[in-house]
Amino acid sequence: MIYVYGDDGADANKERVIAVSVIAGREEWWQSVEDQWVVRCGEIPFHATDCESNHGDYEHIPNEENKAMYRDLTGILAASMVGGIGIAIDLTAQKKIIPGAMPLAYYRAFLECVEKAANVAENLGEVAELTFDISTENEYNADLLYSWARNGDARFRQWLAPKISFVPWRESVRVQAADLLAFEAWKALDHTVGPVKRTRRSWELLRATQRFETYSYSEDWFRDLKAHLDSGELENIVGFNESDYKAWLKTTGCQHSISNLFHFLGWISKKIDNPVTAP
């Protein structure tokens, strides 16, 4: 079994960048990380944003100690055998190029992380079991999206466990590690499109291992997406359009919501019997 742990990160107001990350490894790889992580963190469960900004549990700890904590935990990941990916999406670009678009950035990144987990599982020849941080905003919808993706793709069914799990980040060192990678992913993009442009040393250390990477989606990607939407090409690829969704809402008596959109995707996938395509 390959164990995959995930979390998300964003700027304080979730206005510029959002990212989702996963880190994967065999149990013995994870156990090595966990043993070192617990010793280094002591009684404070790690939270990347708070540690970096001296907030939350780190508010009354000297800045240099917090920076040393972050640096040491990054070093533990870099020296380990686990590997991961962070998917970051430029929310400012989305609002600029496709104003009024549904708030699907988190789920777009989440679904790509699921796909990457399946790739790792296939490469290692073992099924992947995914566990994410509990989020009152996204947990239910992420569960729906995972089920839709897995049920609609034979390769996903082969290499991904039937169910995704959710745990509180404070109770899982492994989710805390994914939180660090998610923080690095959104910072990497934010330092490209935001007011401060620089490369973080912590990210350079992780990237140098060639086991950690980030993908970013910004203006060029959203321009391509808008072109597909305007041309009708995307409709031909996915096999449905907005009118189909509205008709489904009317037939089922449902109101529009992200959850109902994912229920619709599950229904339409079964109807057209096509491979899954990311929303």
What role is predicted for each listed range?
Residues 1-279:
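Phosphate-ester processing/binding pockets and catalytic centers
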